[in-house]
Amino acid sequence: MKILIVDDDPAIRLLLFTVFGEEHDVSVLCDGHNAVSVLSDPNHQFDVVLLDLKMPRLSGEMVLEFLSGWQNIKTKFIIISGFHDEARHFKYPNLVATLAKPFNIKELVRIVETSHQSAAASGA
């Protein structure tokens, strides 16, 4: 599975890379602006994006807003944020979960694996 981590906190980026890096192809970015640049490439092939909500330059919500109008996006998004209550109300087609910081690692791994399996089962 190919995972993109987008978070402005270096400790969170390192933690998530450590959790997923051994078994998956993981890339790490520090802001939403870079995420939009990478995800705008139709050949990016990321299965799952772990996305912080509040970041400098471009927020996670703006990343989702920007990409929501695109057709045929198969990438699944999971928001991990200290602003979980705000994110729970988002209605973006590829947003599969929101987790509050601090989060449970086992729960996150389960959500990532489940979102990838359901996408694969549906042919996405």
Task: Describe the residue ranges of each PLM region.
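Helix N-cap/capping motif at the beta->alpha junctions
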Residues: 28-37, 60
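Conserved acidic segment of CheY-like receiver
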Residues: 1-10, 16-17, 49
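Active-site residues of response regulator receiver
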Residues: 52
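C-terminal output helix
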Residues: 103-114
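Short amphipathic alpha-helix used as the core "switch/output" element in two-component signaling
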Residues: 37, 61-73
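Hydrophobic/aromatic residues positioned on beta-strands within the core alpha/beta folds
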Residues: 75-81
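Receiver (REC) domain active-site loop signature in two-component systems and cognate sites
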Residues: 55
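Two-component/phosphorelay signaling modules centered on CheY-like receiver
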Residues: 10-28
